[in-house]
Every structure is written in structure tokens, then in C-alpha cells.
Amino acid sequence: MATVTTLAYKDVKTVMTKSSLPVGGYSVNPYVGCPHACRYCYASFMKRFTGHTEKWGTFLDVKNWPRITDPHKYDGQRIVIGSVTDGYNEHEATYRRTRMLLEQLRGTSAEIMVTTKSDLVLRAIDVLKTLPKETVSRSVNTPDEAFKDDMDDAPSIERRLSAMKTFHDEGIRTVCFVSPIFPGITDVPAIIDRAKDQADLIWLENLNLRGQFKGDIMRYIADKYPQLVPLYEEIYNKGKRDYWQALEAQVKQICSENDFPYLRNDLPYGRSKPGKPVIVNYFYHEEIRLNNK
């Protein structure tokens, strides 16, 4: 578990932020910072906007916002909770900001999606069941706990998968978010096979390396997986897509053989047929950006 050395309250005018993300009309983050401290996390770039100089993962601001008194304002929207934090990080057990947010949104017809790596979200089953369109998305990019521990301080993969099954069994729409896919490391077919009976959708997103964490990840690969250095050089320094195109073809074959619906850069709503999750490919981020302009 990450050690948060700086914890403070932060007053904000609103917790609801219009989103530029493809998946959300509103992006909602009850906390600033994230104790999971994922080494590959794109959200770490947010630190420059927070006033914090501490290392990403070691600070957390607990947001205070005016109560949402008109949840119907968000009817027909999609609300994503946890785009640059985990609303169910371990401190949620104390501060309950995400719980409070969900309770304030009761009555809206909005589609509400909670993204998390934590099984603390199990505490929210009761309130989620009061919402008409609820989804819980959980990130799983490896069955290897040692690799997971190298990458983040979040709960174990087994705990995540167990929580996913509980939500699915409770009738709550579930997403297994296979992200980020590390070339040569993430076993996508194995994760699809493990999640197929407990997820309505399986999202696939490739590892994108940018900013300060690119160097860190490349050094990690050189140290722990030196045989993969040429592959990572091809993808991340030369811009080659061959690996992703081959993986896409493999996933399409799996879908064809198992009668899994396959989509690209889409976000359908609804429950899947038992054992037939919808597989959604998000490998091509530039296409998503162009389609959402």
C-alpha cells in the first residue's frame, strides 16, 4: 500500500467537470492524487495543476464540494467517476467522498461508471443498485502478481477479479479493463478467458508511453525484460504498429471462435449474454480523438 505523506482537504466549487474523454460527458474525481501510484499512469501529469511538488502517489487532497441538489441536471449524460484518481482508494474507507457523491446523484437517469482497482467498491453495491444505469470498471492487465506489484500499490489481481465476479453476480454491469497492455508481457487471451464469465464488456487498451514515466518504464523493461527491449524500441521510439495489428488480429480470431461481439473505439450500453462479453478495442487513440472532435 502506498504511503500518503501529505493529506489535506480541498474546497472546490463543484466536483462535476465536463469531460473531453471519449467515455464521459462528465469526469468526476472526489480526490486529487492517487495512492495506487501506478508507474504507467497518465494521470500523473495532473500533478503540475495541483500545486503539489511531492511524488505522485504520496499526496491526497480530499475534496469538499457544495451538495448536488438537482441530480436530474445530469439526466441523459454519462458520468465517469475516477478518471484521474481512484474513488475507492484505501482512504475512501475514512472519508467516504465517493459514497457521498453516489448518494447525491440518486434520482438521475445518467449512466454512471465507477473506474477502480480496489475491492473497497464492494461497499457501494447497495447505493449502486439504486441507480438506473450503473457500471463498475476494473483494471486488470496481468495475472502475474509480481509484475503487478512492480507497477502499482493497488489491491491484488485476485481481489480485483473476485470483486468483479461479485458485482456481476449481483446484476451490476461490469467491465474488465485490460489496460495498459504491456507488449510481450500482458497475456490478453488469458485475461479474456478468465474474465469472460464475469464481465459484460472487456476493454483493451495499449500501453502509451509519454512524459516522465516513459523513461522509467523503458528502464524497467531493460532491467527486468531485456529480451523485450528491441520490441519496445520498435513501438515506442520508432512508432511501429505491427505488434498491435497482430494482437488485434489474434483478438478478432478469439472473438470469432467464441462468438464474442467485437467493436473498435465504441462504448455500447447494456448487459451481455452470459459468457459472451463484448470485446472493445481501444488501441488507436488518435482515431478516438478525431471521432470526438
Summary of predicted features, one role per range:
Residues 84-86, 117-119, 139-143, 179-181, ...:
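Active-site beta-loop-alpha junctions enriched in small/polar residues
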Residues 106, 129, 162-171, 252-258:
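Surface-exposed amphipathic alpha-helices with a cationic face
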Residues 1-135, 143-146, 157-158, 169:
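Conserved Radical SAM active-site core
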Residues 153, 165-186, 237-241:
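Conserved strand-turn element in the central/C-terminal portion of the radical SAM core barrel
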Residues 147-151:
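Short acidic, glycine/proline-rich loop/turn micro-motifs
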Residues 66, 99-102, 125, 160-164, ...:
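Generic structural signal for well-ordered alpha-helices
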Residues 78-80, 111-113, 135-137, 173-177, ...:
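Structural preference for beta-strand elements that scaffold enzyme active sites
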Residues 2-11, 189-293:
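Auxiliary Fe-S-binding modules of radical SAM enzymes
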